[in-house]
């Protein structure tokens, strides 16, 4: 069992960026992971099972919306929306590939370090995750250095083993989106085939739904 004594490192480290680097180093030990993920905003709630593999493969099998799938093999992003029987497909540019991995790898966290200012939200002391939970976390506040970033502000809640438990992001349009990660299992040897996806043949395909493909 992980005890609260682990959190002493947060207090011993004098700067938030140094603590953030501990989180980045922890993710540097991870080849892959699976977790239950919930994404919520003021008017939307979705949840499902997340699979991640370095450097930039990701898949979410959604329970809500039921049957929806988001998958990227690092080169192509696909989103299957069964409600409309459509597949949205996007050939990824380099920056978009990085965006998928931003909060799931040592490299991605280093990108955040370069593009955001980092501070403790209130102090380096552990606090409850929220008013309804006694789970203890250290909270970091990240503010964008450039308006080119997708989120103007991020609040990262970090567990005693230096894993991200929750991300609260504020978009450029001031929309707040919360990502919760529960039951994280690391280095499971997730096969490459997990990130291969063939949508139903009857689904309508829409290419380049984010931006025009390159080449």
Residue spans for each PLM region:
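Extracytoplasmic segments of membrane-associated envelope/inner-membrane machinery
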Residues: 80, 87-123, 137-141
């Amino acid at each position: 069992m992980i005890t609260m004594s682990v959190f002493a490192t947060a207090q011993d480290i004098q700067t938030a960026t140094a603590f953030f680097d501990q989180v980045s180093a922890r993710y540097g030990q991870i080849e892959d992971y699976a977790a239950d993920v919930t994404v919520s905003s003021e008017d939307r709630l979705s949840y499902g099972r997340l699979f991640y593999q370095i450097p930039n493969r990701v898949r979410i099998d959604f329970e809500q919306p039921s049957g929806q799938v988001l998958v990227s093999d690092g080169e192509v992003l696909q989103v299957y929306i069964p409600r409309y029987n459509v597949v949205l497909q996007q050939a990824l540019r380099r920056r978009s590939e990085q965006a998928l991995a931003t909060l799931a790898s040592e490299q991605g966290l280093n990108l955040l370090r370069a593009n955001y200012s980092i501070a403790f939200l209130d102090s380096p002391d552990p606090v409850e995750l929220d008013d309804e939970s006694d789970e203890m976390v250290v909270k970091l506040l990240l503010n964008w250095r450039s308006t080119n970033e997708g989120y103007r502000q991020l609040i990262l809640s970090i567990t005693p083993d230096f894993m991200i438990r929750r991300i609260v992001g504020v978009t450029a349009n001031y929309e707040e989106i919360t990502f919760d990660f529960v039951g994280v299992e690391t280095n499971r040897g997730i096969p490459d085939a997990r990130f291969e996806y063939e949508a139903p043949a009857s689904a309508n395909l829409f290419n380049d739904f984010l931006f025009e493909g390159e080449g």
